[in-house]
């Protein structure tokens, strides 16, 4: 068994606080503990196009309250996932469209892990799921977990 976080592998996990994303983080934590991979829990901050912002662009003045809420949600998801204590978990907030941001974040990494369905709601069902987009476009292997 590899030492915690010393294998050089990074497992990227998409986390939005939904049950499937927490299940994905839990699985990734066990995988990271078993392989020595670092687990990077990623929360994507997405501004809908209706907000009048260019896709994938963060406004110059970031709303600190919203960013703090994102950090709290990510921290809560890590707590709910109850990852193996020997797993090396890091957290990150990125900005952009969820599927594209996760694909970008996982580029050059060992594995991308996502839940089968997140908080995308009806619009996600119409446009295709983030999980399917990741499976079809990520450069690394993708694990999709049901929660």
Q: Which role does the model predict for each range below?
A:
Residues 1-7, 20, 79-112:
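Structural beta-alpha unit
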Residues 2-57:
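Small/aliphatic-rich secondary-structure junction motif
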Residues 35-38, 87, 140:
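Short glycine/serine/threonine/alanine-rich loop segments
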Residues 40-42, 90-94, 143:
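General small-molecule cofactor/ligand-binding pocket signal
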Residues 56-60, 109-110:
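Short, hinge-like loop/turn segments at secondary-structure boundaries
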Residues 58-72:
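A short acidic, glycine-rich active-site loop
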Residues 69, 93-97, 117:
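Short beta->alpha linker loops
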Residues 105-147:
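Gly/Ser-rich helix-loop-strand patches that form or flank binding pockets
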């Amino acid at each position: 068994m590899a030492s915690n976080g010393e294998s050089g592998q990074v497992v990227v996990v998409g986390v939005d606080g939904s049950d499937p994303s927490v299940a994905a983080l839990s699985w990734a934590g066990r995988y990271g503990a078993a392989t020595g991979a670092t687990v990077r829990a990623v929360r994507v901050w997405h501004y809908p196009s209706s907000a009048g912002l260019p896709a994938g662009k963060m406004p110059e003045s970031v709303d600190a309250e919203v960013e703090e809420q994102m950090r709290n949600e990510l921290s809560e998801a890590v707590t709910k996932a109850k990852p193996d204590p020997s797993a090396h978990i890091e957290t990150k907030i990125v900005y952009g469209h969820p599927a594209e941001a996760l694909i970008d974040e996982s580029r050059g990494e060992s594995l991308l892990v996502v839940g089968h369905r997140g908080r995308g709601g009806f619009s996600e069902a119409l446009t295709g799921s983030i999980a399917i987009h990741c499976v079809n476009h990520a450069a690394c292997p993708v694990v999709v977990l049901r929660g």
